[in-house]
Regions:
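N-terminal leader/targeting and pre-domain segments
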Residues: 4-5, 18-37, 120
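Sec-dependent N-terminal signal peptides
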Residues: 4-14
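Extracytoplasmic/secreted envelope proteins and their assembly/folding machinery
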Residues: 27, 31, 46, 56-59, ...
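Short active-site neighborhood of thiol/selenol oxidoreductases, capturing the structured segment around
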Residues: 35-47
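Thiol-based oxidoreductase modules, predominantly thioredoxin-like and allied folds used
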Residues: 44, 67-80
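Typically the conserved alpha-helix immediately C-terminal to a functionally engaged Cys/Sec
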Residues: 51-65
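Structural micro-motif
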Residues: 85-94
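Non-catalytic, surface beta->alpha helical segment in thiol-disulfide oxidoreductase systems
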Residues: 97-122
Length: 122
């Protein structure tokens, strides 16, 4: 039983540490990307959230596959940013195109569905 608990603990620690969890959102960079007409993805996360780690893993791959899109992420406990986007939950994913929000999901971690949303915004 102890071995199973140790394995589970190591597994979840690895998942949460495998993704760089930093805030890359800066309002001035977001505004510039909007004014430049870029497609923008904003994602929210929180420490120790395994679904956040799963979503970040998909988005990290998407950055390589959709390099014409600007990506921002932030810790949902940052109330100023969360209120700016009207986000109340971690793993909220937003896509902006032509200066408006065109997609919003909460908790989506499926690569296929996230990629479909990205493709439809291009």
């Amino acid at each position: 039983m102890k071995k199973i608990l140790v394995i589970i603990t190591i597994f979840f620690a690895t998942i949460s540490l495998s993704c760089a969890k930093e805030t890359t959102f800066k309002k001035e960079l977001f505004d510039k990307a909007l004014s430049d007409g870029k497609i923008i993805v904003v994602s929210s996360w929180i420490k120790y959230c395994t679904s956040c780690a799963s979503q970040m893993k998909v988005l990290d791959k998407a950055k390589k596959d959709f390099d014409n899109i600007e990506y921002f992420k932030f810790d949902v406990t940052n109330k100023e940013i969360a209120e700016f986007f009207n986000i109340q939950y971690q793993t909220t994913l937003l896509i902006f195109k032509d200066n408006k929000e065109v997609y919003r999901s909460i908790g989506e971690t499926t690569k296929e569905l996230i990629y479909d949303a990205l493709k439809s915004s291009i």
